[in-house]
Design a protein with these regions (language model features):
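N-terminal, active-site-proximal structural segment of metallo-dependent hydrolase catalytic domains
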Residues: 1-47, 51, 57-63, 78
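Active-site-proximal beta-strand elements of phosphoester/diester hydrolases
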Residues: 1-9, 98-110, 142
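Active-site beta-strand/loop signature of hydrolases that rely on acidic residues for catalysis
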Residues: 7, 23-41, 101, 130-151, ...
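Metal-dependent phosphoesterases centered on the DNase I-like endonuclease/exonuclease/phosphatase
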Residues: 30, 51, 122-211, 215
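Structured beta-strand-rich core segments of catalytic domains in phosphoester-bond hydrolases
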Residues: 37, 43-109
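Conserved beta strand-loop-helix elements of the APE1-like EEP
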Residues: 60-75, 204-226
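Active-site beta-strand termini and strand-to-loop segments that position acidic
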Residues: 70, 94-97, 221-222, 247-251
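Surface-exposed cleft-lining segments at the edges of enzyme active sites
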Residues: 81-82, 107-123, 158-162
Length: 251
C-alpha cells in the first residue's frame, strides 16, 4: 500500500500548480493533505476512484485536513474528542481492517512561541489518543507535525534552537511519542541520512540552497515496522513550501 502525505499550503493554490497531475503520477492508495484552507463545497475538482473526507477549520481559509482514499474506510472520525481541539480541522482518523490512519496538521507554536503552551498540551492529548487507538489495532500517523526532531532533521540547528518547531520542549514531546511504541519510518530506514528535508522557507532561496527542515512524517506503531517497505521524501515535487512524504507499507 502506498500512502502520501503533503502539506499543500492552500489546496486551491496547489490545484493551479499541478496537484491533479501529481495525484495521477503518484498513484497512491491514500493521499493525506494538511493546510487545505478549503471547505468541501469549494472542492470543485474531479479525482476519480477516491473517496474524499474533509475536516475544515471554523475560520475560513485556515488550517484544514483531507484524506483521499481508494479503499473505503470502515469508519471516519474527525478531531479526537477534546473540545478545545475541535475548531481548527486538524485531525482525520480513518479506520481500515488492518490499521487506523490518523492524518494530522499539528499546531505551530507561532512567533515568539506565543502558542507553545497550547502546542505542548496538544502533544500530550494526541499522544494519549494515538496510544488508545494502538491498543485496538496498529496506527499509521502522518502529516505536518511541525517539529524537526533531531539536529539531523534541520539544516541550521544552532540559530533555530528557540524557534517554533525546534524548541527543546517540542522535540521532547516527539521523543516521548516515539518512546510510547511508535516508529519514525524515515529514520528507521535511514538513520544517518543528511540533507533530507520536507519544508523550506519561501525566504532566502531556502529551497534552492536546501536549507530545510524535516517536519512531515509517517509514524507507525512499533509492530508495523517490519512491514515498512520504503519511506521517502519527494523533494522534487513543487506546488507548496512543503513537499510530499511517502510510505510504502506491506498491509
Amino acid at each position: 500500500m502506498k500512502l502520501v502525505s503533503w502539506n499543500v499550503n492552500g489546496l486551491r493554490a496547489c490545484l493551479g500548480k499541478g496537484f491533479l497531475d501529481f495525484c495521477a503520477v503518484a498513484d497512491a492508495d491514500i493521499i493525506c493533505l494538511q493546510e487545505t484552507k478549503m471547505r468541501p463545497e469549494q472542492a470543485e475538482f474531479d479525482l476519480p476512484g477516491y473517496h474524499r473526507y474533509w475536516n475544515s477549520a471554523d475560520k475560513a481559509g485556515y488550517s484544514g485536513t483531507a484524506v483521499f482514499t481508494r479503499r473505503q474506510p470502515l469508519s471516519v472520525t474527525y478531531d479526537f474528542g477534546i473540545d478545545e481541539h475541535r475548531h481548527e480541522g486538524r485531525v482525520i482518523t480513518a479506520e481500515y481492517p488492518e490499521f487506523y490512519l490518523v492524518c494530522c496538521y499539528t499546531p505551530n507554536s507561532k512567533d515568539q512561541l506565543a502558542r507553545l503552551d497550547y502546542r505542548l498540551a496538544w502533544e500530550d492529548d494526541i499522544r494519549d489518543y494515538l496510544c488508545e487507538l494502538d491498543e485496538k489495532k496498529p496506527v499509521v500517523y502522518c502529516g505536518d507535525l511541525n517539529v524537526a526532531h533531531q539536529e539531523i532533521d534541520i539544516k541550521n540547528p544552532g540559530p533555530n534552537r528557540r524557534n517554533p518547531g525546534f524548541t527543546d520542549e517540542e522535540r521532547e514531546k516527539m521523543t516521548k511519542l516515539l518512546s510510547s511504541g511508535f516508529v519514525d519510518t524515515f529514520r528507521y530506514l535511514y538513520p544517518d541520512k543528511t540533507g533530507a528535508y520536507s519544508w523550506w522557507s519561501y525566504r532566502f532561496n531556502a529551497r534552492k540552497n536546501n536549507a530545510g527542515w524535516r517536519i512531515d512524517y509517517f509514524i507507525v506503531s512499533e509492530r508495523l515496522k517490519d512491514k515498512i517497505r520504503n519511506a521517502d521524501i519527494w523533494s522534487e515535487v513543487l506546488g507548496s513550501d512543503h513537499c510530499p512524504v511517502v510510505l510504502d507499507l506491506d498491509v
